[in-house]
Amino acid sequence: MRLILLGPPGAGKGTQAGLLTKKHGIPQLSTGDMLRAAVAQQSEIGKRAKAVMDAGQLVSDEIVNQIVSERIDAPDCANGFILDGYPRTVPQAQALSQMLSGKGLKLDAVIELKVDENALVKRMESRVAETIAKGGQVRSDDNPEAFRKRLVEYREKTAPLSSYYAGTGELRIINGMAPVEEVTAEIERILVPA
């Protein structure tokens, strides 16, 4: 199973990817996690990514495409993967298509979680409060100003992916405002039709 989860920041892509990973035994490939790992390691790419992420902007396609291509080649991706937060732009989607084709692979589905932006701000605030309550570290881009920038960036650069994947016939749209369990059940219906 090779799947892309689309939706704005805070839509629940990471939550759904985590649930699908547990059920199907395939890895969740979160570019955010991969980029944060590079930042934590303070590599050259990590330092460049940190400056961009702290400003609430998206990391360049070149860096992200390279990270994703290398990750897809890992042995744990042999039976599939769930892409969370990638592709973010139509050029990245085109690069992914070429990348997968070159590896003899194709996507099984692209699922978009549709959500209300006002509700996203509340979700972000809840995520921050929950992280703090658990004694965890809050992401540097989980603040209202950076979050609003991420939403604007999403509308400008990532939202066009809906049209792109609708054109390829791979797009399936789900109400991301539904309870987590209902969203998961709807994704499962798409992946394993009755």
From Swiss-Prot:
Alphabetical UniProt keywords: ATP-binding, Cytoplasm, Kinase, Nucleotide biosynthesis, Nucleotide-binding, Transferase
Source organism of this protein record: Brucella abortus (strain 2308)
Subcellular location: Cytoplasm
GO cellular component: cytoplasm
Reaction(s) this enzyme catalyzes, per UniProt: AMP + ATP = 2 ADP
Gene Ontology biological process terms, A to Z: AMP salvage
Protein name per UniProt: Adenylate kinase
Function noted in UniProt: Catalyzes the reversible transfer of the terminal phosphate group between ATP and AMP. Plays an important role in cellular energy homeostasis and in adenine nucleotide metabolism.
InterPro entries named in the record: Adenyl_kin_sub, Adenylat/UMP-CMP_kin, Adenylat_kinase_CS, P-loop_NTPase
Gene of this entry: adk
GO molecular function: adenylate kinase activity; ATP binding
Quaternary structure, from the entry: Monomer.
Residues the entry annotates as binding AMP: T31, R36, Q57, L58, V59, G85, Y86, P87, R88, Q92, R139, R150
Region NMP, residue ranges: 30-59
Pathway: Purine metabolism; AMP biosynthesis via salvage pathway; AMP from ADP: step 1/1
Region entry LID, spans: 126-142
KW Isomerase (keyword) present: no
Description of its domains: Consists of three domains, a large central CORE domain and two small peripheral domains, NMPbind and LID, which undergo movements during catalysis. The LID domain closes over the site of phosphoryl transfer upon ATP binding. Assembling and dissambling the active center during each catalytic cycle provides an effective means to prevent ATP hydrolysis.
